Amino acid sequence: MPKTEEHDRLAEARAGREWHRWGPYLSERSWGTVREDYSANGAAWNFLTHDMARSKAYRWGEDGLAGICDRFQVLCFSLALWNGRDPILKERPFGLIPSEGNHGEDLKEYYFYVDSTPTHSYMKYLYKYPQAEYPYCRLVEENARRGGQGPEFELLDTRIFDEDRYFDVFVEYAKADTDDLCIRIEAFNRGPEAAELHLLPHLWFRNVWAWGENRRREPVIQPGTAADGYVTLVADDTDAEGLDNLPFKYSVGRRRLYGEADGHPLFTDNESNFQRLYGPAADDGRKYVKDAFHRHVVNGEATVNPAARGTKSCLHYRRMVAPGGSTVIRLRLTAASLAAPLVDVDALVDRRRHEADRFYAQIHPKGASEDERRVQRQAFAGLMWSKQNYIFDVDKWLDGDNTKLPPPVSRREIRNKHWRHLNSMRVLSMPDKWEYPWFAAWDLAFHTVAIALIDPDFAKEQLWFMLFEQFQHPNGQIPAYEWEFSDLNPPVHPWAVWRVYSMDRIRSGTADRAFLERCFHKLLINFAWWINKVDSQGNNVFEGGFLGLDNITLFDRSEKLPGGAILEQSDATGWMGLFCLNMMRIALELAKENRTYEGLATKFFQHYIYIGAAMKHMGGRGYDLWDEEDGFFYDVLRYPDGHFEKLRVRSMVGLIPLFAVERLEAKWIAQFAEFTGNLNWFLENRQDVVRHCVNRISGSAGETLALTIVGPRQIERMLQRLCDPDEFLSDYGLRSLSRAHRDAPFVLGGNRVSYEPGEADCKIKGGNSNWRGPIWFPTAFLMIESLRKLAKAYGDDMAIVDRAGRRWTIGEIARTHAERLIAVFVRDASGRRPEYGSIEKFQTDPYWRDYLTFHEYFHGDTGAGLGASHQTGWTGLVASLIDEWRAH
């Protein structure tokens, strides 16, 4: 593959050059997060609201529009806007909190991650800013009025974009060098009349000085040189005290923000406005505070520092934009003192844009259409823009910074008290920087698979961070997410480690054994934790826990069940089967150079066999998770007195045992003498358990062992449902719940599960997600991968005939599901994108129709995007699907 300029930068970064020092690491929402919650009751969304955010200094991380910062978030840059009508300066995206949204928290803005290279040498972002007053109150009131049953009331529904009275604000970043960033902001007036727009590029320091018993020395921003054609802001932390949770001295030094000459510099401090937040009696004597620019620009108050210095600054531009016209602002953030800093900004932006084109031309598969390339590139852009500084010291957060002003003691018992070791200053891949601006371990595993296509080093780094001592618990558990690090998530980390390692080895030609080995050692600890914690009966059947599929069952699986009942879960057991197979595969890879690992490969093979057998026999209790009558796996509710109840819900839970699939070719494993010997002994002497999980397939190339928790007949019966449009096969991929439950809901003890293809009617885990019918990319992706393994093992010998009489091979089933997932985003024959449903603005308007959002999940019947609108995280897997299914 020909190398491009971006490939060269990635190689330089691997060698130590800091191309990643600056990036889109600024969050889009720090208010309402657990990190900023110091309440007595753990009500994070109410402790620091959107309305308070403009006035309160954040403790653990900043936010903004189209923002960037350095990798430790010392110095931040973002854009604020004002249309002359809004009641507040638009400094950060707005959305509803869970108690306001009729389906949980919900972003109410339109912005798009248009482009980004892996080193962020080029980035592009689009924000659509209405010219009329933003309807904050109406959005809150109407969504509250609708309740949980009605559709969400969106910003477009307010008709604020009628007659195209809005600005398209594009922000482009281009790195001239590692510490030299060119910034180009262009705002287009799409409306029929001239309109004024205030643009305020912000430059500020994160507040790290105000939290302890004694204030630390502060950095400063002051005016710099003003010459023909530009003004300057100079930020300097040289004399400030450094970050206290890094083992080394770090500063950004002296930085200059050059801007066009009509920008008026404004200065204040990144300090809380105590009087506004807590009343007049709370005055701490500080005159220049965080919300000064809002009050100055919107209300005309004299709130900025006339001495022209502070820790927060901006350049205030006022531009009148003609109808159909645009205005451009050029800026440059650099360590260098430049005589003509803005002269070559346009040329540098253009150059980096063309380099990005060349880079992605090498990434896109040959068989991808122009529209599929657009989808893939914007998916990569979303993954890159979703990087965020995740700054959180749980020990300090629990106890408070200032011993003289400690937070309420009660909060120590609410969440995360067992995670005091967790201390992050890392740049992490977020699920969604507004809706989920915190890492989620199982989400992150899926992110890395798509990211590895363009930046395998970053993908490997992300996987290792979750296993690093400052994240992984000493007992072996991988932290789930900040709302409760102790929650259980599906153990997909070994799968991601193995897959990213394999992708990197194939593409680079070099096997990163060191990465694989160190991850394997930490995953051994994690496996031991799962065995000791979650298999409470020691019968290789796993129970309890959240496991990521929020509302898929009758109960909230994070909570204990009444009466001492235990939920024995087919998905938990299936996930553990997948865990075992991936660990076996990694151990065999490591055994190529160190035969010691063959014994561990045997261990995980045997664990897998016992898990598979247990799903069939449940320790001789007279029931199992497989239901022969229905041909499906069901959860079992087991009571203390020994009686049990099958939960006959046909959902993703019952399909997950299909994920636990691997194939071993006899010729390939022959190189591992000890493993092969142990394997053969097991096959010959433990037929009672092996016959359920190992199928020998003879072919022209020799014998293949198909390792499957489900036997061939069971596979065929499950495949029937995967091909049935009245069950799991949607026009847009794999449904999470069978459509059969539309007419036949499952009811038990007043709880009910029915087919809900759109938003959820219940509010388990906040209510903003739904696993009772919609399509989810991560589980659909794993299903496709499992089907491909089965197809390679069985070939065309295993096939099913659907109810319509069509014959399906396993490979055809896999391709059908993959094609339908890709079709969610790609224009159909009529030019419409299913993900945008019936929203005509997105379907037909030339300024909207080619800007994509990668929603959290998708309607089970229409493919319309639902949930978080920027969860490029795991929905970015569409980039992997395009890569794999358009290779030729």
Question: Where do the protein language model's features map onto the residues?
Answer:
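Acidic, mature catalytic/reactive cores of soluble proteins
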Residues: 1-59, 65-67, 72-73, 80-888
